C-alpha cells in the first residue's frame, strides 16, 4: 500500500531543520510531497518559483520526495493529490497550539486527513526561516543552518 504524505510550509527559505523532517518523513511514508505555500500574507523573501527550485535541489537525493507549490486550502491540495497524511514539525509548545488548530480545521474540511507531528532533531529545534534570515541580515554566520545552495541564494538576495 502506498502511503502518501504531505509536508506543507512556506519554506522561505528551506532550512536544515526542514530537510531533517522531510528526510525522516521520507523514511516513514512511501511518497512525500513537500508542498510549498504561495503565502502572500507572509511576504516571503523568495518567490514561490525560487523556493520550489531550492527545495528540489536540496531534496534531490530523496527519491520518494516530490516538491510542488500550492495556493489552495491544504485539505483541497491533499484531496487533489490523494494524500491523507500531513506531516508537521513541532519545535515548541507555541508551535503545538497553532498546529492543533490547523489539524482540527483540516480534519473538519477533510475528515480522513490525519496530522502526524515530528519533533526536530535537537540541533535544529531552535531554527526557523525567519530567525536565519534575521541573522543573515545582520552579518551572522548562517552556514550551519542552511543547505549550501540555500545559503548562496540567501546571501545573493541580501547583497
Swiss-Prot record:
List its EC numbers.
Answer: 2.7.7.3
The residues that hold substrate are 10, 42, 74, 88
Where is the signal peptide, in residue numbers?
none
At the top of the EC hierarchy, this enzyme's class is: transferase
Q: Which cofactor does the UniProt annotation name?
A: Mg(2+)
Q: Which CDD domains match?
A: PPAT (cd02163)
Which domain of life does the protein's organism represent?
Bacteria
Q: Name one GO molecular function term.
A: ATP binding
Q: Name one GO biological process term.
A: coenzyme A biosynthetic process
Kindly list the GO CC terms recorded for this protein: cytoplasm
| Alphabetic keyword roster | ATP-binding, Coenzyme A biosynthesis, Cytoplasm, Magnesium, Nucleotide-binding, Nucleotidyltransferase, Transferase
Give the main localization category.
cytoplasm
| Site, Transition state stabilizer: residue positions | 18
Q: Which reaction does it catalyse?
A: (R)-4'-phosphopantetheine + ATP + H(+) = 3'-dephospho-CoA + diphosphate
- Cited function: Reversibly transfers an adenylyl group from ATP to 4'-phosphopantetheine, yielding dephospho-CoA (dPCoA) and pyrophosphate.
HAMAP family linked: PPAT_bact
Q: What is known about its subunit structure?
A: Homohexamer.
Q: What is the protein's name according to its record? A: Phosphopantetheine adenylyltransferase
**Underlying gene:** coaD
Amino acid at each position: 500500500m502506498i502511503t502518501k504524505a504531505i509536508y506543507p510550509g512556506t519554506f522561505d527559505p528551506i532550512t536544515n531543520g526542514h530537510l531533517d523532517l522531510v528526510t525522516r518523513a521520507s523514511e516513514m511514508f512511501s511518497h512525500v510531497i513537500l508542498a510549498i505555500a504561495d503565502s502572500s500574507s507572509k511576504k516571503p523573501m523568495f518567490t514561490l518559483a525560487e523556493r520550489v527550485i531550492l527545495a528540489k535541489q536540496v531534496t534531490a537525493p530523496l527519491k520518494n520526495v516530490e516538491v510542488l507549490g500550492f495556493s489552495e486550502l491544504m485539505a483541497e491540495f491533499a484531496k487533489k493529490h490523494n494524500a491523507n497524511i500531513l506531516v508537521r514539525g513541532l519545535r515548541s509548545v507555541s508551535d503545538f497550539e497553532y498546529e492543533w488548530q490547523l489539524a482540527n480545521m483540516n480534519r473538519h474540511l477533510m475528515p480522513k486527513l490525519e496530522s502526524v507531528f515530528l519533533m526536530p532533531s535537537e540541533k535544529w529545534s531552535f531554527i526557523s526561516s525567519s530567525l536565519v534570515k534575521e541573522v543573515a541580515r545582520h552579518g551572522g554566520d548562517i552556514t550551519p543552518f542552511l543547505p549550501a545552495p540555500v545559503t548562496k541564494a540567501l546571501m545573493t538576495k541580501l547583497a
